[in-house]
Amino acid sequence: GDAVIRSETNTAISTQSGYGVVELNMTGGTISTGSSTGYAVYAREKSRVNIGGGNVTGGTAVMVYDSANVTVTGGTLEGKKAAIGKGSSATPVISVTGGKFSSDVKEFVPEGNTTDTDSEGNFIVVVDKAKAVAEANGVGYTTVQAAIDAVANSDAAGTVKLLPSKAESVAVPAGANVTLDIPAGVTLTNTNGAHTITNSGQLAITGEGHVD
């Protein structure tokens, strides 16, 4: 939605979990603080913060402490100090696979991805073609199975694109709807004599590549 949450001098939202695990899901709107040293979102303790859209702005857009779990798949995070900060003694889980950022978030992107800048100077997440073997929904994966699982765990059908040739036996789980795109010159082969693809869901194969 278009909700606006703002603090002029302090943290706009703190997810301190005094009554069980607190979860913040943001798909739009704005969370901001006018403080140049404040946090727009302060993720604390065992809370969960999921940002898929909207704008988060502060001294630090999202500050993560303790063992909080933060996932960013979209939106714009802008901080005068940092887009995402982490406490020095904190042990959180932070995963960034999409969005735009005022500072580099490379340390938070999963293997198979890296960061670049767009035409406006924002940091964005891109597939690391040197490490990823497959891509799904703009995110790179270091195994084909991980990309298939990502589609299977989503709410919709999706396409997994094989990047280089790969020797890997994979499985499409029941309930999944996956299109496997194999470009020309690329081959998916089995390992240890197993079936290359075991399909228990819905599978379509496109492209001019091969499955052996």
Regions found by a protein language model. Give the residues of each.
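Nucleotide/phosphate-binding loop and acidic/charged catalytic motifs
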Residues: 112
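A motif-centric signal for short, conserved binding hotspots located
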Residues: 108
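Acidic Gly/Asp/Thr-rich repetitive segments characteristic of extracellular carbohydrate-active
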Residues: 130-163, 167
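N-terminal extracellular ligand-recognition/capping segment immediately after the signal peptide
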Residues: 8-9, 157-193
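Short, surface-exposed beta-strand/loop "edge" segments at domain boundaries and coil↔beta transitions
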Residues: 13, 91-93, 141, 168-170, ...
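Surface-exposed loop/turn motifs in large extracellular/passenger domains
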Residues: 1-6, 13-35, 42-59, 63-78, ...
